[in-house]
Amino acid sequence: MATFDDAYKILMKNEGGYVNDSDDSGGETYKGVSRRYNLDWKGWEIIDNYKRSYRRKALCKVLDADDKLQSMVKTLYKDKYWDVFDLDSIPSQTIAYQMFDTCVNCGETAAIRFAQTSLGERVTGHWTLNLLNKLAAIHT
């Protein structure tokens, strides 16, 4: 079965540290967590406190060294993008990771629509047990 920890390790290789790029549609982000799309995430309080005392390079180092913040990042990804789809029940780590990564980068509805389209399902944008079962039946 797929495991979140394995998927998270791959995701973290692809997601950066702290960025506040006005040209990025996600706006201010930390490890891929967009403030714009995760306004209520408590990790922003920690980041904002550090921003008062540290500039860019030092800020990235201190954020990455904060164990509580790292735990909060991991929990957000697990709760919002992994557990919501019950990806632990998919046998293929590759398929589970693709669903997870697509959800992180495109949003839940888009990820569901992509999966429905690729599996010949009626495209509703809603997660269903049938879709989960079809994903679970794919062996890579």
Segments from the language model and where they lie:
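Cell-wall polysaccharide-cleaving catalytic domain and substrate-binding groove, primarily
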Residues: 1-140
